[in-house]
């Protein structure tokens, strides 16, 4: 934001909302702030990058008492090097170089169920057809939808 632009304390707002609900929370703000120098958000979009989602997932796992993931568990695949997100489209910051979209998770042994049309149907973790269009971010899960369930079929339940 420009110097002197009105703003509000997002951390205080999040803390206040958490206290009012009394529900358990996950400190995503702290997890992302720890990695502020890394590409956790797209420069041209409001979404987390896959790297940001990795740190968010680890914050959730830690809050649940589970072992965090390691970056070495993944082999990132570059899906697109020409992603221009909604900030690019709406702000006039067209001098920024496009972002890169990475896929970190293999679709092997993963079942995705979508309710995109309002009824249960098979889904996909990555819908690569979106990579040929402007809305490349929708390549994740086929875009926004009311509900999507991912099941790891190779996970052993004890």
What name fits each language-model region?
Residues 156-158:
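Conserved small/polar residues in nucleotide/adenosyl-binding loops
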Residues 63-154:
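Secreted/periplasmic serine-hydrolase-like ester/acetyl group-modifying domain
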